[in-house]
């Protein structure tokens, strides 16, 4: 009789605790071997709550421009003001940091693969900068050819690319 009472209490305790334990387990991410799955009832939208063990596939010619920017800016510290002015006008301000900014843009084009040994990667330039037409690529590669300073020569090519891109953009407005 005593053992039947203990067994009945154990069954009642189990029935009471089971739903609470199951609910607690559902609130934790589960590992299906590849991706952590979250119970969306408890997901608050915070990116930190999501993690994965596999990276997303990338295109063969993918360029991580943020990483390139960090690497080049570590060596050639360039203000965002100079970068934005160059991106909008094709010119750098005449200040004490102009040569450093020239080296930054040369570095950026080299490290991103847009240019290698003063030769433009036509596919990447067309994909990321502007759809170069005619002899634009060859004309830009010829810029600064007599320049002995690597930064100056690279910058001359980059400036040509941006100037032509900006000119094309102004002449062909988008709808």
Curated annotation (Swiss-Prot):
SUPFAM superfamilies: Insect pheromone/odorant-binding proteins
Any one biological process term the GO annotation gives: sensory perception of chemical stimulus
Main location: secreted
Pfam families hit by this protein: PBP_GOBP
Record bears the keyword Zinc-finger: no
GO molecular function: odorant binding; pheromone binding
Top-level lineage group: Eukaryota
Tissues and organs where the protein is expressed, per its UniProt entry: Present only in a small number of hairs scattered over the surface of the funiculus.
GO cellular component, one term: extracellular region
Disulfide bonds: 103-151, 140-160
Keyword Secreted found: yes
Keywords noted in UniProt: Disulfide bond, Secreted, Signal
Places the protein is found: Secreted
Gene3D superfamilies reported for this sequence: Pheromone/general odorant binding protein domain (1.10.238.20)
Signal peptide: 1-24
Name the UniProt record assigns to this protein: General odorant-binding protein 84a
């Amino acid at each position: 009789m005593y053992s039947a009472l203990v067994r009945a209490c154990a069954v009642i305790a189990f029935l009471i605790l089971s739903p609470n334990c199951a609910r607690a387990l559902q609130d934790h991410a589960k590992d299906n071997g590849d991706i952590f799955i979250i119970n969306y009832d408890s997901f608050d939208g915070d990116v930190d709550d999501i993690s994965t063990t596999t990276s997303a596939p990338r295109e063969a010619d993918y360029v991580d421009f943020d990483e390139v920017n960090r690497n080049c800016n570590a060596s050639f510290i360039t203000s965002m003001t100079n970068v934005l002015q160059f991106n909008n006008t094709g010119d750098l301000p005449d200040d004490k940091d102009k040569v450093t900014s020239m080296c930054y843009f040369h570095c950026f084009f080299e490290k991103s693969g847009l240019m290698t040994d003063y030769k433009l990667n036509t596919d990447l330039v067309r994909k990321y900068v502007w759809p170069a037409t005619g002899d634009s690529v060859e004309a830009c590669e010829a810029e600064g050819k007599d320049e002995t300073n690597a930064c100056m020569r690279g910058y001359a090519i980059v400036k040509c690319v941006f100037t032509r891109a900006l000119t094309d953009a102004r002449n062909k407005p988008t709808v």
